Amino acid sequence: MAIRSYRILTPDTRNRSVSGFDGRVQLDPQKKLTSGQHHCGSRNGRGIITARHRGGGHKRLYRQIDFRRDKEHISGKIVTIEYDPNRSAYICKVHYKNGDKMYILHPRGVMIGDTILSGPKAPISIGNALPLTNMPLGTAIHNIEITLGKGGQLARAAGAVAELIAKEDRSATLRLPSGEVRLISENCSATIGQVGNITANNRSFGKAGAKRWLGKRSEVRGVAMNPVDHPHGGGEGRTPIGRKKPVTPWGYSALGKKSRKRNRYSDASILRRRE
């Protein structure tokens, strides 16, 4: 999946590039596998911004993705590989032998016409989903469950991949894409392989409007604000922040401060923090 650049016809196409994939099919999504979304522009019931730099964007239909992969021992055929505006990865439409149709994340290397399988007896092949206890050490995996039966929650972005590095005492040790090493029940399932569209991070938007299409608003520097809006604000002309260290709009340290809450339930499962 190479990066596709634009011809320089206007200033916004000078540096713009997108992910290109010849095998992707440009089709409307399966209507029964979509649902509407309500966007609140990151405002709560009183109209107050609760998450900055979000709002606007193109209307989207949510594609219902099968993160559980619980169609055990029922083979499915990859029919299409489609674009999903709600995530960086592509998705596949799967037709199962029992007549069901589902969307799944597109594993790297899986093409239209390939067959996938789920369940404890599924072979070790890219796109198949099975419990961690049935996988050999060193297997590359994605869409990993944390809670048994809840569905995959880890390693779902484009190009994401984790590694199974150990199994002991009914627990599996995984190295996650962030570099974190943690324990997960070996009964939890995962999908073999790496998520596709590995060049998603190499694309260049080319203009601010391309980010507005995605629902991302611009960020304003604190020193450009008034003192009422940010601790860095105020002063005559171009002035420094007036502090030893940068802070957030709420006065907390902005660089190097650990933001994870103490005594979380998952602390005992994390063997090494992320890098």
Curated annotation (Swiss-Prot):
GO terms for cellular component: chloroplast; mitochondrial large ribosomal subunit. SMART domains: Ribosomal_L2, Ribosomal_L2_C. Its main location: plastid. It is found in: Plastid, Chloroplast. GO terms for biological process: mitochondrial translation. Coiled coil: none annotated. The keyword Plastid applies. Part of the 50S ribosomal subunit. Belongs to the universal ribosomal protein uL2 family. This is Large ribosomal subunit protein uL2c. It comes from Picea abies (Norway spruce). The gene is rpl2.
